[in-house]
């Protein structure tokens, strides 16, 4: 059985983008933000973000960049009116880009399981530990992707989930470096 801890928040990956969004800056203000916009087409989520920009703002990412509307792009990447990547676990992000498709980290575990952990009956057993607020997203993603990968690899997946215990959560700190805890 392949065991996968999949509750890790992606918010840390976007720390600089959150800081930029909350700053007074109107244009990229550090090397990371500049690189994000210069290299934007290389991100696996680029096409999905571009579709959201067109749907929500009526303009492509390129048009928004041309108009210096950087924060609109960041907002649509990070928040629920767009891709909501600032609130999702890393496993649900479009993370790996291939010539014809993209995969989430979650799907990469399905692929790895098929390649390395299938048994003599071509069954693949994978267990994911997830956060309670994301379990339904993982289950929906699994159901949308499972047929494709069972067919591709000629395997049968047996995927289970459990909830990560709050006692194992990572300590959260604010922008000032001081630990904090929400009431919930």
Where are these regions (language model features)?
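Domain-scale recognition of functional cores that engage charged ligands
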Residues: 1-184
